[in-house]
């Protein structure tokens, strides 16, 4: 049996500095033609930027999660081989996150994989909150005709969330405004 990631659940997900803890989760968007788009994302647990995301009409694989991790790393630090210091990577217990090759890759690039307690989605409340916000403020107003149309809108939605969407926890700044110290 594969070893499970260590768990944390200290009741607080947010941290006081960027690039200390990142969280990740996924969600599904149902299209009017019955197609489904599955999205996984990573958030910084301080500034709440959606640093990276992946989307597919199939299942979220461990390979897509490894791509997601690498994109987050490159978003924050440029083209580097690994994080300049260990960064916690908080996820639920989905198979794409707990797969041995995903956990090994995370460690190889300087991420410390941590999982929430089983049956405890509130343990990753920041990611859960992002999903609610994204579905309420973007998906609900988007063109959901088919998967191709939805996937074409995702870059604009994520960019708007990062550049414009205010957060009460960030004194009503957007994630990138907060990250830039504006």
Residue ranges and their predicted role:
Residues 21-76, 87-88, 116:
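A short, conserved beta-strand element enriched in hydrophobic/aromatic residues
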Residues 80-99, 117, 173-176:
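Acidic/histidine-rich, metal-coordinating catalytic segments
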Residues 14, 107-111, 132-182:
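C-terminal domain-tail junction helix/linker
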Residues 25, 42, 48, 69, ...:
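Mobile genetic element proteins and their domesticated derivatives, centered on retroelements
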């Amino acid at each position: 049996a594969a070893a499970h990631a260590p768990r944390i659940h200290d009741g607080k997900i947010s941290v006081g500095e960027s690039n200390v803890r990142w969280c990740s989760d996924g969600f599904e968007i149902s299209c009017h033609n019955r197609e489904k788009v599955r999205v996984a994302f990573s958030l910084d647990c301080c500034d709440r930027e959606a640093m990276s995301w992946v989307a597919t009409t199939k299942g979220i694989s461990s390979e897509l999660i490894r791509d997601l991790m690498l994109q987050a790393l490159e978003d924050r630090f440029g083209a580097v081989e690994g994080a300049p210091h260990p960064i916690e990577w908080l996820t639920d217990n989905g198979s794409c996150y707990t797969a041995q090759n995903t956990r090994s890759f995370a460690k190889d690039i300087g991420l410390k994989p941590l999982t929430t307690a089983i049956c405890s989605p509130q343990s990753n409340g920041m990611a859960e909150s992002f999903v609610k916000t994204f579905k309420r403020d973007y998906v609900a107003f988007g063109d959901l005709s088919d998967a191709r149309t939805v996937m074409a809108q995702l870059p604009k939605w994520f960019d708007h969330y990062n550049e414009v969407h205010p957060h009460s926890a960030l004194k009503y700044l957007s994630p990138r405004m907060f990250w830039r110290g504006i």
